[in-house]
């Protein structure tokens, strides 16, 4: 059986932790930031986690993580 391929787009965006949780960064933090307030930008710096079916789908794309 051939090796499974890692989905490179998913590999760049998600990280599977030891606990099995899938970590991701938040959107809306790359440009057009001047009108966003400091509190909002500070919240966007923090990572968040996928749950349920979303996490399962991403894990399927990352077979070696």
Curated annotation (Swiss-Prot):
GO molecular function, one term: structural constituent of ribosome
Name under which the protein is recorded: Large ribosomal subunit protein bL35
PANTHER family named in the record: 54S RIBOSOMAL PROTEIN BL35M, LARGE RIBOSOMAL SUBUNIT PROTEIN BL35M
A Pfam match: Ribosomal_L35p
Species this protein is from: Thermoanaerobacter pseudethanolicus (strain ATCC 33223 / 39E) (Clostridium thermohydrosulfuricum)
Example of a GO cellular component annotation carried by this entry: cytosolic large ribosomal subunit
Entry keyword set: Ribonucleoprotein, Ribosomal protein
Top-level division of the source organism's lineage: Bacteria
Gene behind the chain: rpmI
One GO term (biological process): translation
InterPro entries: Ribosomal_bL35 (IPR001706), Ribosomal_bL35-like (IPR021137), Ribosomal_bL35_CS (IPR018265), Ribosomal_bL35_sf (IPR037229)
SUPFAM superfamilies from the UniProt entry: L35p-like
Protein family membership: Belongs to the bacterial ribosomal protein bL35 family.
